[in-house]
Amino acid sequence: MKQSARTTILTLWGALVTALALSLSITAPAVALDPGGREEALPTTPPPDPSVPSIGTTVLSDGTPVGIVVAGGNGGLLHVVDLNTRTLRSRERLVPENTDVQPWEFATLSNRHVMLASGGGQLFEIDPDAPEGQKATNLSDPSRPGYEQVAAYSTFLWDVAVDEHDRVYVATQSNHGGHILRYDPSANQGRGQWTDLLPGGVQAGESDVRSLAYDNGFLYAGTGTKNPSIVRINTSTNAATRLAVPSRVTAGLSHLERLQVKAGNLYVGTNVPGGVRPTCGGTCVLDPVTGAQKMKDGKALEVDTWSSQVVTRPGEAEKVYYTVQSHNTPTLQEYDPRTNTSRTLAQGLACTARPSQSSWATHEHFISAGKDDASIAIVHASDGSATGLPQDANGGNAIQGSPRDIQSLTAVPGGDLYASWYMTAPMLLRTTPNAQVDKTQYSLPQAPLGQVEGFGHSSKWFVTGIYPSGELVRYEMGASGPMLENHQSVRITPDARQARPYAIVPINDDEFAVGASPKNKPGSGALSIYDAAHNKIDTYPLDTISYADPSLRGLLSDRRPLSIVHHQGKLYVGTSASGNGMNPDQTEASAPRLFEFDLKTRKVTRVMTPFKDQRSITALTLGSDGTVYGTTGMHVFAMSPADFTIGRSRALTRQGYADANRSQLIERDGVLYGIMAGRLRALSTSLQDEGTVIADFATTPQGKAYVNSLALGADGSLYYARGSRIYRYRFPAG
């Protein structure tokens, strides 16, 4: 600690004593705060309904056609479905716990193995003939040649395609742009080989390659999110050409969700969420060489898929297939581009079931599944019959949900906790804690479909912010918690652009401040004021928000509000850095901001840059002393609202890092408890030391399970999650 200079004349001995004391005050380490509590693991949480974005198919060694249905989540749950008998053949965990499995697309190799592109960033090879516990192999592993050179490009895998040589292509999303990675399973004596097909990325400025299709030596890639386009790649030379796609095809799209190519036709999905007919009815038919729209008899070829999902079928040279509601009946349709007509192949499919690119296992057998309820539809084409799966031997659903990582958590008056998971679900997790851990109770009340990004509540209202619809859903608060039976909702913006309501903070009993980010994250977010009593919202995008001082204009552009506190008629809001928040060479111009917003004038009144080298102000809280405390994951700071200055700060040189994601910070009895760098840390509001890690992340061979979603329970304990499990930190009695 720095001490003030002395002005008195000291004796020599006094000077020596004083110098020694001063030296000790500077060099002696501060004693780290230890709350003296203990961590308790609550019982295993029940999984929500299955998350099944896509399914695969293959044929077993004995000739049996099967569906490969993976429920996404923590480790995933693999179901093998017999398509002949329409029964469940087996169910087992796909891979070990702490592996994030999100089954976005499948493709089948000539050896009948199934490749799974996972949103967790892995490529899995599945052999359904293998013994239990040995069916899946994670190919995204440093032991595979070339993987370490491409790992940074595979944060998320969206799609997968294979060529006639069994080379596998995956579409990726990363902070280094969207890439196409190629995996050759036969290279290096069967050890495989990873390569980056187009070094430098597919399209400058795009973080995603969203869709792939392969045909006759050429790979087609659909990009997003700023300027969606289609790239045609010669897989022999890796020469890439951007197709001249008509602007009407991509107008209004944030990405190209589905491509399919068959018999000289390139099918491009154009579905935009909403109630209006999408361009081309959902799928445009283009020339795969030029990108021009295909015509027949003077009319553009269009397919009324609505959902953009077009798939091919073994043994069919030209026709493609899709599902659609016809006269309120879910049907499987066959489209013939030679006549530009469709016919019904089967009726009575599950209403939420949608096809995947490998839905046809054979010319006879088709399977589809509902993304958020795993409602299965199995079609036998010869008789046009469509049926689901019977219940399993225990009377439960044949397709069951996998444990999923908890990503949002809140505590409400009355003692209950409410949580939501990564990936959308039509329910919430309600937890009723008990002093005896084994008496904790769980339930899964129904709620609007979505991924809850943030919770907020007052004495009168309980509010959830859900992705991808960008809606706020409000419920009345009862004596024992929210009354979930009745709810109303409102979109933050009519076009659902602001799709991630991360921060929801009460202003008074009826009003909430909301900080939202765009669906695809880069770009400006928005600050909203939500009137729950009247279900009305006023939204202020940060790129057009009003300033009391014109000289501040533009300082918040290209940033997203991640943390908010309310104090005496003002909001204090912490933002991300500009762009995607991942710039390692952050400058003053691109750094995260802390700003003050006047609720009366609805204008930004003050803006500061606390740290230019950080990625986000991930959490803010109001202390009992009226001080605003915040963190970036690497720094903790105290800000005085009166003069809008940083009074003190502490760099977390041990076990800290500059985080980009929102977190939580709570002040209790002069101690800050916050999630920083994936750990729960306790430190004094004096910020004299780095504090103590009271709950660390868990390390397993599959990876780390970070601490997240902190809440202060009605019982005075801290509750938080690691993976799919909830924990609490109990303070000493008294």
Predicted stretch roles:
Residues L77-H79, Q122-F124, H179-R182, P228-V231, ...:
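A short loop-to-beta-strand structural motif that recurs across blades of beta-propeller domains
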Residues V66-V70, H113-L116, R167-A171, L219-G222, ...:
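Conserved beta-propeller blade signature
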Residues N271-G281, V514-G525, G574-A591:
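Short, conserved, GDST-rich strand-edge loop motifs in beta-rich repeat architectures
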Residues G703-G734:
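Blade-level signature of beta-propeller repeat domains, shared across WD40, Kelch, NHL, RCC1
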Residues A71-G73, G120, S174, T225, ...:
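Residue-level signature of beta-propeller blades and closely related beta-rich strand-turn architectures
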Residues L33-S90, S368-A369, A386-T410, L417-A419, ...:
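An edge-strand/N-cap motif at the start of beta-rich repeat modules
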Residues P43-T45, E92-N98, T137-A151, Q193-G205, ...:
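Surface-exposed loop and turn segments in beta-propeller and other repeat-based domains
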Residues D49-V59, T99-A107, V150-V160, G205-A213, ...:
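Repeated scaffold domains used in trafficking and secretory/extracellular systems
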